[in-house]
Swiss-Prot record:
The keyword Signal does not apply. This is Hemagglutinin. SUPFAM superfamilies: Influenza hemagglutinin (stalk), Viral protein domain. It is a single-pass type I membrane protein. A lipid is attached at residues 552, 559, 562 (S-palmitoyl cysteine). Its main location: virion. It comes from Influenza A virus (strain A/Mallard/Astrakhan/244/1982 H14N6). The chain crosses the membrane at residues 527-547. Residues 1-526 are extracellular. Disulfide bonds join 25-479, 63-290, 75-87, 108-150, 294-318, 486-490.
Length: 563
């Protein structure tokens, strides 16, 4: 047992570096609790630091800057364009985003728009309700018809941008044949309509003819509508309806109105600009006094992250919508928390075994022990090399994904339900595809980050090993035992790459000669261990046998052998 203890003590002195030689260890930064990220091969890799790429927070209001907002309040965009009562304040307004409220209501004669979404999109993208009034000559009819369903100031009225034509005082109606040429330099939008009476009597009372017809033509298009006469559920005490149509007239083209009854005529046109990127947003959020480049139906997003999980409907300079609530991009190396009571300084060994939680001013660094004491220093060069690669990658990732993203809501009439289903399928597929691509892209970047940081650690280790050469011995755990006196200046030269092994070569060789014989003879340790173990077992067995014989002689144990 004494021999075993002596051999173990001698071996511990050699392996723990208590020979008095200087030791320098290479290490990397670590934290007590790292962040888990996904890579191509592992769903949970702990790293020192990571950046969240998905924005999940938003303000509960719409910011009117830098995007100019127009609040429709009780009026939607179509009613504003038609000039419904209560919507007059919207005339000639301009916007980047027109805010439609879910509480908006129709306030005039009940109407429908067969191509509602297209008209809404054209008006929204034009960015204004700039109306140009025109003089029309409607011969043989009575103009400025009104309805009790369309009260303005307590009196019967009508859509301010439309002219309801009925039979003249002599009882006749037209016929109408009016032409307007677009002599301007912009596209004109004409709104017009067809009245569908609730009965044959109403038809003849208003238009004399039993069956009316409206035809509107341009060089490239023509539409002809015959009214559908019949009773419908009453809306604002009216069972008749008006269908609203629209026509775009390019510069140099003309629009022709032909009718023998039931025409709801225009009073002018809207100036359409194709150079703007304005839009419409339906939301119940109030307009605040904040600033945000990104609006959603749920509020504003103020973030520099490349992705968001707030809403599919996003307008402005917005992060892309993804289905994932979190995508963590590694911005630091693999985290290996430090082990306790082991290695240099009684606590920490080199990078192969664990990281250093105390290395706060760099990712990679050195710790040493010599005659002057102990010390720690970061290696800024390798740290900066890794940071540059990671930051460059982060900037490229944000640049790729944080482009202007514009997704507006889609609306369809019930008769277009199949189109709505198809549109929803396409949008869902696009989101699924982009969400998958985003997750794959982040996993690729995380894999590369970890590989880069591991590579920089290995580069630093190889640089030190090539400097020291035969003047030191690799202990296999990220540390080197130096076989010559190495003060703090010497340690610093190893760290900064100016170490000259030739200066210390002779001293290191002499010290190796003194140490190696002792080290080589330590091979007897295994022999002593086995001999000690065998002798201990022999003594233990002999003691047991002696006790049994003594007990048998005193009658305490009786042995019977049966054959």
């Amino acid at each position: 047992l004494v021999a075993l203890a002596l051999s173990q003590t001698a071996y511990s002195q050699i392996t723990n570096g208590t020979t008095g030689n200087p030791i320098i260890c290479l290490g990397h930064h670590a934290v007590e609790n790292g962040t888990s990220v996904k890579t191509l091969t592992d769903n949970h890799v702990e790293v020192v630091s990571a950046k969240e790429l998905v924005e999940t927070k938003h303000t509960d209001e719409l910011c009117p800057s830098p995007l100019k907002l127009v609040d429709g309040q009780d009026c939607d965009l179509i009613n504003g364009a038609l000039g419904s009562p209560g919507c007059d304040r919207l005339q000639d307004t301009t916007w980047d985003v027109f805010i439609e409220r879910p509480t908006a209501v129709d306030t005039c004669y009940p109407f429908d728009v067969p191509d509602y979404q297209s008209l809404r999109s054209i008006l929204a993208s034009s960015g204004s309700l700039e109306f140009i009034a025109e003089q029309f000559t409607w011969n043989g009819v009575k103009v400025d018809g009104s309805s009790s369903a369309c009260l303005r100031g307590g009196r019967n009225s009508f859509f301010s941008r439309l002219n309801w034509l009925t039979k003249a005082t002599n009882g006749n109606y037209g016929p109408i044949n009016v032409t307007k040429e677009n002599t301007g330099s912009y596209v004109r939008l004409y709104l017009w309509g067809v009245h569908h009476p609730s009965s044959d009597n109403e038809q003849t009372d208003l238009y004399k003819v039993a069956t009316g017809r409206v035809t509107v033509s341009t060089r490239s298009d023509q539409i002809s509508i015959v009214p559908n006469i019949g009773s419908r559920p009453r809306v604002r005490n009216q069972s008749g309806r008006i269908s609203i149509y629209w026509t775009l007239v390019n510069p140099g083209d003309s629009i022709i109105f032909n009718s023998i009854g039931n025409l709801i005529a225009p009073r002018g046109h809207y100036k359409i600009s194709k150079s703007t990127k304005s839009t419409v947003l339906k939301s119940d959020k109030r307009i605040g006094s904040c600033t945000s480049p990104c609006l959603t139906d749920k509020g504003s997003i103020q973030s520099d992250k490349p992705f968001q999980n707030v809403s599919r409907i996003a307008i402005g300079n917005c992060p892309k919508y993804v289905k994932q609530g979190s995508l963590m991009l590694a911005t630091g190396m693999r985290n290996i928390p430090g082990k306790q009571a082991k290695g240099l300084f009684g606590a920490i060994a080199g990078f192969i075994e664990n990281g250093w939680q105390g290395l706060i001013d760099g990712w990679y660094g050195f710790r040493h022990q010599n005659a002057e004491g102990t010390g720690t220093a970061a290696d800024l060069k390798s740290t900066q090399a890794a940071i540059d690669q990671i930051n460059g990658k982060l900037n490229r990732l944000i640049e790729k994904t944080n482009e202007k993203y514009h997704q507006i809501e889609k609306e369809f009439e019930q008769v277009e339900g199949r189109i709505q289903d198809l549109e929803k399928y396409v949008e869902d597929t696009k989101i699924d595809l982009w969400s998958y691509n985003a997750e794959l892209l982040v996993a690729l970047e995380n894999q590369h980050t970890i590989d880069v940081t591991d590579s920089e650690m290995n580069k630093l280790f190889e640089r030190v090993r090539r400097q020291l050469r035969e003047n030191a011995e690799d202990q296999g755990n990220g540390c080197f035992e130096i076989f010559h006196q190495c003060d703090n200046n010497c340690i610093e030269s190893i760290r900064n790459g100016t170490y000259d092994h030739n200066i210390y070569r002779d001293e290191a060789i002499n010290n190796r000669i003194k140490i190696n014989p002792v080290t080589l003879t330590m091979g007897y340790k295994d022999i002593i261990l086995w001999i000690s173990f065998s002798m201990s077992c022999f003594v233990f067995v002999a003691l047991i046998l002696g006790f049994v014989l003594w007990a048998c002689q005193n009658g305490n144990i009786r042995c019977q052998i049966c054959i």
